[in-house]
Regions:
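Domain-edge interaction signal
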Residues: 115-121
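Short amphipathic alpha-helical interaction segments
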Residues: 48-65
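Minor-groove-contacting beta-hairpin "wing" of winged helix-turn-helix DNA-binding domains
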Residues: 75-80
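Short alpha-helical segments that sit at the start of domains
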Residues: 1-34
Length: 121
């Protein structure tokens, strides 16, 4: 199945959330898991998406049906296929994130002294 942009976004959000949430537990034999409802709640509260909770739930169901995520014992997680797709998405967007960070951190005008300016009307 080809992933739609919405499915890619949800898969990336879930994968990145797990990656960041579990960083604090690297030295311990523990792992954080969340339910579908909690994931939807986190995504909505953080303002990551504008979709209705029902639409997010349906997208998670589609990802589960196509074996990108699994839901066992109220724990939502990426499958091997989902992990592989997440890593590919991350690899594809990393250059854009790096450029955005570089431009945001340092004044873009400081990279060159030969810039041109024109009056805009």
């Amino acid at each position: 199945m080809l992933l739609t942009p919405t499915h890619k976004f949800i898969l990336f959000t879930l994968g990145f959330w797990y990656k960041e949430a579990n960083k604090k537990l690297v030295s311990k034999p523990l792992q954080i898991f969340i339910s579908k409802a909690l994931f939807i709640d986190i995504v909505k509260k953080a303002g990551m998406v504008e979709k209705q909770p029902r639409a997010l739930y349906k997208n998670l169901e589609t990802l589960e049906k196509n074996r990108f995520v699994e839901y066992n014992n109220k724990c939502l997680s990426l499958t091997k296929k989902g992990e592989k797709a997440f890593l590919k998405i991350q690899k594809d967007i990393t250059p854009y994130i790096i450029v955005a960070r570089l431009v945001a951190e340092k004044d873009p005008l400081s990279y060159s002294k030969k810039l041109q300016t024109k009056f805009s009307l």
